[in-house]
């Protein structure tokens, strides 16, 4: 194996530690802190000349701080003559700002971040479940977008006593993801929630396409933000006779009123991964369970370093 060095900022230190343990490596020695005026301070405290370096850092909240930590770390490592630098970004922030809706005067911030990373010297990006896969095209360097679905599906099959399960997409846009999950779950049935607002100033109506009565529903999505829509979807499923409702998502964004929303009785359990650390408020709910993607990300890092196929992990 080439001379691999792993570094991390302050966004996801626990995930970085798990990845390093899977690879039987120690995390690199780096100081990542703040100067007295709040500016980010980075110093690499070991030799990285010619090394294959991986920086593990989600750009979750505080998004701008974590993004700048990553950028400054890349620059420090580049100036220290690292051989190759891969940014391992388990959760890629700003991914939802990937287009101009109806030609509004707004930025395409996902493209700005991609340019930012390329300009400071990132050679490659490894990320997980991009909100929009076309964001890969915003980069001028190779991007490997791996999927959390195998880890989630393994949990669905092994850890929960599902009774007559059905996979549910919370919206039309998530149908492809839900179909892929359903296929991995022995081609189980699928349902779709079609959200519509009949006219202005009229409450949104949720139409459920599929029979969920008496069944365990598995709501799947790439991320959970405030959880408001998710809870409304769970309530609609229970009203249609669903026995239990489980929510599975890769990224636990959990912003705003998420803790209040997730406390809803309509949701029996929420299962996420460790791409984003949970806040104490969310942990206190005792309803959110966390799976680790460290094994999958460690294997992806090993394959990248050895110039092996990443897509073969999912075939």
Swiss-Prot record:
Enzyme class per UniProt: transferase
Pfam families assigned: Pribosyl_synth, Pribosyltran_N
Keyword check for Amino-acid biosynthesis: no
Reaction(s) this enzyme catalyzes, per UniProt: D-ribose 5-phosphate + ATP = 5-phospho-alpha-D-ribose 1-diphosphate + AMP + H(+)
Family: Belongs to the ribose-phosphate pyrophosphokinase family. Class I subfamily.
CDD domains, sorted: PRTases_typeI
Entry GO terms, CC: cytoplasm; ribose phosphate diphosphokinase complex
One of the GO BP terms on file: purine nucleotide biosynthetic process
Binding of Mg(2+) 2, residues: 171
Annotated binding of Mg(2+) 1, by residue: 131
Primary site of residence: cytoplasm
Designated name of the protein: Ribose-phosphate pyrophosphokinase
Binding site for D-ribose 5-phosphate: 197, 221, 225-229
Subunit architecture: Homohexamer.
Pathway where this protein functions: Metabolic intermediate biosynthesis; 5-phospho-alpha-D-ribose 1-diphosphate biosynthesis; 5-phospho-alpha-D-ribose 1-diphosphate from D-ribose 5-phosphate (route I): step 1/1
Note on how the cofactor is bound: Binds 2 Mg(2+) ions per subunit.
């Amino acid at each position: 194996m080439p001379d691999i060095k792993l570094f991390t900022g302050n966004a996801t230190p626990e995930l970085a530690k798990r990845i390093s343990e899977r690879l039987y490596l120690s995390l690199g020695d780096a100081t990542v802190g703040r100067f007295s005026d709040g500016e980010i301070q980075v110093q690499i405290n070991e030799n990285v000349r010619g090394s294959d370096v991986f920086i593990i850092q989600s750009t979750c909240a505080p998004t701008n701080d974590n993004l700048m930590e990553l950028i400054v770390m890349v620059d420090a490592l580049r100036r220290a003559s690292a051989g190759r630098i891969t940014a391992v970004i388990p959760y890629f922030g700003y991914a939802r700002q990937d287009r101009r809706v109806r030609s509004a005067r707004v930025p395409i911030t996902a493209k700005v971040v991609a340019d930012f990373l390329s300009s400071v010297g990132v050679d490659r990006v490894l990320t997980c479940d991009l909100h929009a896969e076309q964001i890969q095209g915003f980069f001028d360097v190779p991007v490997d977008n791996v999927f959390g679905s195998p880890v989630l599906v393994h949990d669905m099959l092994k850890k929960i006593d599902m009774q007559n399960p059905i996979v549910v997409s919370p919206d039309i846009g998530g149908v492809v993801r839900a179909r892929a999950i359903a296929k991995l779950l022995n081609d189980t049935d699928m349902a779709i929630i079609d959200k519509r607002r009949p006219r202005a100033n009229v409450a949104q109506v949720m139409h459920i396409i599929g029979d969920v009565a008496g069944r365990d529903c598995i709501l799947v999505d790439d991320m959970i933000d405030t959880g408001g829509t998710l809870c409304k979807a769970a309530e609609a499923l229970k009203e249609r006779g669903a026995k239990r409702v489980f929510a599975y998502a890769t990224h636990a964004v959990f912003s705003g009123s998420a803790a209040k929303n997730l406390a809803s009785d309509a949701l029996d359990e929420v299962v996420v991964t460790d791409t984003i650390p949970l806040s104490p408020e969310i942990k206190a709910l005792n309803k959110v369970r966390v799976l680790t993607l460290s094994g999958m990300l460690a294997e992806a890092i090993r394959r990248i370093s050895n110039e092996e196929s990443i897509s073969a992990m999912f075939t």
